[in-house]
């Protein structure tokens, strides 16, 4: 018997997928509509439009923007459309929501853009931890994306994987 140690994990056909590889890489800027509201409470159309005209939207050029309103004000839908029209001229990538929500939305979109054919018939382990906190939504998205393609889908690490799905 040889004393050689064999790394069975390295020699296995398993593919380890780290969802953090699909995390958004561009920084997300926040534009809070409350800054354009009268006393940050309600919208006066004339003043709202005037403040938007005076605002320097060039700070958002070619950036990802989380557009939201952090106050409890009731903001009409057209106000978000109007702000979006200004951001569009700055070539911004605009999403509605808080910064973290937009991050998760883009993250899920990145997972959705994965080509499942590259995992056709393979055994895939989705890592359970990484540098970025991952939400249940992301694990649901990858399961939906890969289940009909892979031969086996697992969660965790190769040394302690939890079976999720196995093609029969």
Describe the role of every protein-language-model region:
Residues 1-74, 91, 149-152, 156-157, ...:
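N-terminal, charge-rich interaction modules
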Residues 42, 104-111, 136, 143:
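Peripheral peptide segments
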Residues 48, 52-53, 94, 128, ...:
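A domain-level signal for the structural core that forms small-molecule/cofactor-binding pockets
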Residues 64-70, 95-97, 123-129:
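Short glycine-rich or small-residue beta-strand-to-loop segments that form or flank ligand, phosphate
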Residues 70-77, 129-136, 160-161:
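Gly/Ser/Thr-rich loops at beta-strand to alpha-helix junctions
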Residues 79-118, 156-161:
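Long, charge-dense
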Residues 80-88, 138-147:
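Short, non-transmembrane amphipathic alpha-helical segments
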Residues 116-140:
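Extended, charge-rich low-complexity interaction segments
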């Amino acid at each position: 018997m040889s004393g050689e140690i064999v790394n069975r994990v390295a020699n296995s056909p398993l593919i380890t997928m780290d969802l953090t590889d699909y995390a958004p890489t561009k920084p997300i800027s926040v534009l809070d509509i409350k800054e354009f509201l009268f006393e940050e409470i309600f919208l006066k159309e004339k003043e709202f439009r005037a403040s938007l005209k005076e605002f320097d939207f060039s700070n958002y050029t070619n950036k990802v923007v989380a557009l939201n309103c952090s106050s409890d004000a009731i903001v009409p839908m057209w106000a978000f459309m109007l702000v979006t029209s200004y951001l569009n001229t700055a070539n911004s990538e605009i999403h509605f929501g808080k910064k973290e929500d937009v991050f998760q939305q883009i993250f899920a979109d990145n997972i959705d853009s994965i080509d499942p054919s590259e995992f056709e018939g393979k055994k895939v382990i989705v890592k359970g931890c990484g540098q970025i906190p991952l939400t249940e939504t992301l694990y649901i998205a990858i399961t939906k994306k890969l289940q009909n393609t892979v031969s086996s889908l697992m969660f965790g690490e190769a040394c302690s994987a939890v079976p999720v799905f196995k093609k029969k």
